[in-house]
């Protein structure tokens, strides 16, 4: 998608960042008085609010979804299932394929001059381990990385002091043309680890001819992460006139098709929508010589493995592949061994699942019914500082909407983001949160990776996630870029099966452990999951069609302004 606000975005010869005022204009005056009348409550009439109210009986006759529910079938997103069945099998004859350049790394004299002991000490200090044959030495400054001046000047203009650990080792690895696996926590600077070598790679290739597809393909699990990667590529590729587009579901295909047909050197995509484009003949992957799989573990968690395999089958086998992941489970290892050749690997931090040590983790063992009161108590304290930002995670989209409505009616400036929201609403919510206009964002796990808001100070896990990996990723939204953060987690007896893993993570990070949590570990084995949607009866039917905004984000703020 070209930019957020639909204002032209990244066209062939113009690099407008697009979308500047796109959000606010698109939504009249933000919260202002723009919500109009609410019709007959949440379920009754549509009301005259945002473009036809909340979509008629969106919340199902009366109750929270006991009745027929709205017509809403979600906002699109990436289809699963039979995607890719229309793709032709490629027979690659490497002898007839055009040759391409992928090795650009020349070791800086300062790097060569270091003794092996100095290299080992640097790696130890950065908690870095490497594997594979002939792994290049890490660089300690931007100048040592050997980037061309047009890349270096842009990096320095951003005010970075020195490379992060993953960049120190990742840049020489990627610039050398080798296949690379990088394992590092989210927020460690891995996007630049592959973006800058990608720009060097593109500039060494022949120019695109009409009808050519991209040279660099970056696959990402979510729309949010894809847009964030696009922002980095745009920033650093500007001086080389590198064009890019972002291809993801949940938005109209028109602008994406237009960008692809004009020609782009970089395509950032979620797997489902990219396969749609390939099947429709809107682009091809014959020119791709630099492939990136970002957050590979997350893509596999989300069930994208069949699509990833189909996409890779369309790319020449002598390409360079870089795979980035926050964890290294067996499924990710299998993917690496299937698609990477003679790869070299860098790990930052422990190979065991561990949380960022700059995050204070507070776990409270409470009942389901205490959660709302506890959340309000914490928010009262958190929001004493106007600069704080709080991300609240829930287990389901329904609870995300309920809590957002509850908070707004209680006077808190909260908005929610999840997979059933239209893309433009998600973009708008994210922007309100980033700019601090709405410092409380309620989210499901779709937002737990790839949302790059650097200054989140607090995370509240209203519902505990299904596994400890997701717990670590959720709390990793705070404490980024060297800052400290706080994560507050509500843990109920329904979560007892997860207690042991959680205690392991807390102990490793030297955090206090609630005695009731320790007790649960001793007696766990029971617990299990309660009866589905519990208190409110059936799930009801999504959002209803119609209004531009879902009811939760359009709920008026109560008179008792809390912030």
Curated annotation (Swiss-Prot):
Top EC class, one word: hydrolase
Binding site residues for ATP: 184-191
Limits of the Helicase C-terminal domain: 374-521
Region (RNA-binding RGG-box): 523-545
Main location: cytoplasm
Biased composition (Gly residues): 17-42
Catalytically driven reaction(s): ATP + H2O = ADP + phosphate + H(+)
Residue intervals of the Helicase ATP-binding domain: 171-346
Motif (Q motif): 140-168
Subcellular compartments: Cytoplasm; Nucleus
Gene3D superfamilies: P-loop containing nucleotide triphosphate hydrolases
Swiss-Prot/TrEMBL keywords: ATP-binding, Cytoplasm, Helicase, Hydrolase, Nonsense-mediated mRNA decay, Nucleotide-binding, Nucleus, Ribosome biogenesis, RNA-binding, rRNA processing
Motif DEAD box mapped to chain: 294-297
Keyword set includes Cell cycle: no
Gene Ontology MF annotations: ATP binding; ATP hydrolysis activity; mRNA binding; RNA helicase activity
Domain notes: The Q motif is unique to and characteristic of the DEAD box family of RNA helicases and controls ATP binding and hydrolysis.
Family: Belongs to the DEAD box helicase family. DDX5/DBP2 subfamily.
Function: ATP-dependent RNA helicase involved nonsense-mediated mRNA decay and ribosome biogenesis through rRNA processing.
Record note on quaternary structure: Associates with polysomes.
Protein name listed in UniProt: ATP-dependent RNA helicase dbp2
The species this protein was found in: Emericella nidulans (strain FGSC A4 / ATCC 38163 / CBS 112.46 / NRRL 194 / M139)
């Amino acid at each position: 998608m070209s930019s957020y606000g639909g204002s032209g975005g990244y066209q062939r010869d113009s690099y407008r960042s697009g979308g500047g005022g796109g959000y606010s204009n698109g939504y009249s005056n933000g919260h202002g008085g723009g919500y109009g009348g609410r019709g007959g409550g949440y379920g009754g009439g549509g009301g005259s609010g945002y473009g036809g109210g909340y979509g008629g009986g969106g919340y199902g006759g009366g109750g929270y979804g006991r009745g027929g529910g709205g017509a809403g079938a979600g906002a699109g997103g990436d289809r699963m299932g039979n995607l890719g069945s229309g793709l032709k099998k490629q027979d690659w004859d490497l002898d007839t394929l055009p040759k391409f350049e992928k090795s650009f790394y020349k070791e800086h004299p300062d790097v060569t001059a270091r003794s092996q002991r100095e290299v080992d000490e640097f790696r130890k200090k950065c908690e870095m381990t490497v594997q594979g044959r002939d792994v290049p030495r890490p660089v300690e400054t931007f100048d040592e990385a050997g980037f061309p001046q047009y890349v270096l000047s842009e990096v320095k203009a951003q005010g970075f002091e020195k490379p992060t650990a993953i960049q120190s080792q990742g840049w020489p690895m990627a610039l050398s043309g080798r296949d690379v696996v990088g394992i590092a926590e989210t927020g460690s600077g891995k996007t630049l680890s592959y973006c800058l070598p990608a720009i060097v790679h593109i500039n060494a290739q022949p120019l695109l001819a009409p009808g050519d597809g991209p040279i660099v393909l970056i696959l990402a699990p979510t729309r949010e992460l894809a847009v964030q990667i696009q922002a980095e590529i745009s920033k650093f590729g500007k001086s080389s006139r590198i064009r890019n587009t972002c291809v993801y579901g949940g938005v109209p295909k028109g602008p994406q098709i237009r960008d692809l047909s004009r020609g782009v050197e970089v395509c950032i995509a979620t797997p489902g929508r990219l396969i749609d484009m390939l099947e429709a003949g809107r682009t091809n992957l014959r020119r791709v010589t630099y492939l990136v799989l970002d957050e590979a573990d997350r893509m596999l968690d989300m069930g994208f493995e069949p699509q990833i395999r189909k996409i890779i089958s369309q790319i020449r086998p002598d390409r360079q592949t870089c795979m980035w992941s926050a964890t290294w489970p067996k499924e990710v290892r299998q993917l690496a061994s299937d698609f990477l050749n003679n790869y070299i690997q860098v790990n930052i931090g422990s190979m065991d699942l561990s949380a960022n040590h700059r995050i204070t983790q507070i776990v409270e063992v409470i009942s389901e019914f205490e959660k709302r009161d506890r959340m309000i108590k914490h928010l009262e304290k958190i929001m004493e500082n106007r600069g704080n930002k709080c991300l609240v995670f829930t287990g389901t989209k329904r609870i995300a909407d309920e809590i957002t409505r509850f908070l707004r009616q209680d006077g808190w400036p909260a908005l929610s983001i999840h997979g059933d929201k239209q893309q433009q609403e998600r973009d708008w919510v994210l922007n309100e949160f980033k700019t601090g206009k709405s410092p409380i964002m309620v989210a499901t796990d779709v937002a737990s990776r790839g949302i790059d808001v650097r200054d989140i100070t607090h995370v509240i896990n209203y519902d505990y996630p299904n596994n400890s990996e997701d717990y670590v990723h959720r709390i990793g939204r705070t404490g980024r870029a060297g800052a400290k953060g706080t994560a507050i987690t509500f843990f109920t007896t329904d979560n007892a099966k997860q207690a042991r893993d959680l205690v392991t993570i807390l102990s490793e990070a030297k955090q206090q452990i609630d005695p009731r949590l320790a007790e649960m570990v001793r007696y766990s084995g029971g617990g299990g999951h309660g009866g589905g949607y519990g208190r409110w009866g059936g799930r009801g039917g999504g959002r209803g069609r119609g209004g531009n905004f879902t009811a939760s984000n359009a709920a008026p703020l109560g008179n008792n302004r809390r912030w």
